[in-house]
Amino acid sequence: MTIETLLQNHPALIACRDSVESARDLLIDTYRAGGKLLLCGNGGSAADCDHIAGELLKGFLSHRPLSEEDCLALAESLPDGEADPDLYLLAGQLQGGLPAISLPAQTAALTAVCNDTDPALIFAQLTWALGQAEDTLVCLSTSGNSRNVVLAAKAAKTKGLRVLALTGENDSKLSELADVTVQVPATETYRVQEYHLPVYHYLCAAVEEEFFG
């Protein structure tokens, strides 16, 4: 999938081309540096976080077969070596992955924060605990002003992470904080989310192409 394909299928996103390309470059730089993605959002955007992580952790548009080096390492590490009955399954079906963590999926930790400190800190606490300087926090908020997401962005910046925001078209607290903001051309929640989907599908495809061909 190319940027041209994205814009041909969704002409309204032409105005976002520069920011989408900057987002792509940011994600590629993150993975080149050995970093990971942390993703946060509420409601439908929380589901989008799970969706994005799913596209990155395994094959999306390509199969991402293991390298010969990885297959050899498997054979050498299994108890029965090449005779191990699980070698064929592991070497043949495991896929290359790109590390991404959906923070809304961390139910036990989120509810602990809600119960023990402040519900507004659910994503900030996990970002603080999991984030490293080479990582990027991806914030999805249709308004760009969701308090728990904004607090996570502030925590991320303090720890040296970069921040990518996907929002609606209006300037927002997230657009002030983020290194890159993709402001899709809509304000209604469902319309913003409908634009976010093709944007992040393109980003996942572009990152996959960069690292797995």
Where do the model's predicted regions map?
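Glycine-centered short loops/turns at secondary-structure junctions
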Residues: 34-35, 134, 160
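Short, glycine/polar-rich helix-capping loops at beta-to-alpha or helix-loop-helix junctions
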Residues: 165-178
